[in-house]
């Protein structure tokens, strides 16, 4: 599976969105695969929930939604600072982005990061047909997106 992921990373360089989502059931090995890739490339995967949560905690409630995207871009820039520019950005644990009070589109935010840099991210939901789904329909954090413009690697 690691070899397949590495091949995909090499193939997405010319795409408009250079985003690969690792998708699979809970405990299927998505995070483990991301860590294996990180170890091979000597890159530490970014724990988005931890890093972004720290910064949002210092942001007033009424500005968090507006700030979340900018803070994520800042964190991503800091993460790649000093790294080889061709190295992909590895993202994990970005469930915080689905918080309804932020009123943001998590997939769009991650897609925007992937316009200029390859991004490999663990999708915290599942793939249903051609739809990326996060949480059940009855859950306040429920989201349903088309997988258009995203390379999906099913685990």
Where are these regions (language model features)?
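Short glycine-rich substrate-engagement loop in P-loop NTPases that contacts/grips substrate
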Residues: 50-80
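N-terminal pre-Walker A segment at the start of P-loop NTPase domains
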Residues: 1-13
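Post-Walker A helix-loop "phosphate-sensing" segment adjacent to the P-loop in P-loop NTPases
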Residues: 38-46
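Hydrophobic positions on the alpha1 helix immediately C-terminal to the Walker A/P-loop
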Residues: 33, 37
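P-loop (Walker A) phosphate-binding loop of NTP-binding proteins
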Residues: 25-26
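Pre-Walker A (Motif I) flank of P-loop NTPase domains
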Residues: 14-22
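Conserved glycine(s) of the Walker
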Residues: 29
């Amino acid at each position: 599976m690691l070899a397949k992921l590495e091949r995909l990373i090499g193939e997405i360089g010319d795409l408009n969105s250079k985003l690969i989502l690792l998708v699979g059931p809970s405990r299927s090995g998505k995070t483990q695969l991301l860590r294996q890739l990180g170890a091979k490339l000597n890159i530490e995967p970014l724990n988005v929930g931890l890093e972004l949560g720290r910064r949002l905690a210092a942001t007033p409630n009424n500005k968090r939604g507006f700030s979340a995207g900018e803070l994520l871009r800042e964190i991503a820039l800091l993460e790649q600072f000093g790294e080889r520019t061709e190295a992909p950005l590895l993202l994990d644990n970005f469930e915080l982005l689905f918080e309804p009070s932020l009123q943001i589109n998590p997939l769009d935010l991650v897609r925007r990061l992937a316009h200029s840099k390859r991004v490999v991210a663990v999708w915290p939901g599942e793939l249903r047909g051609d739809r990326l789904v996060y949480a059940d329909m009855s859950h306040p954090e429920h989201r349903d997106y088309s997988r258009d413009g995203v390379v999906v690697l099913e685990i």
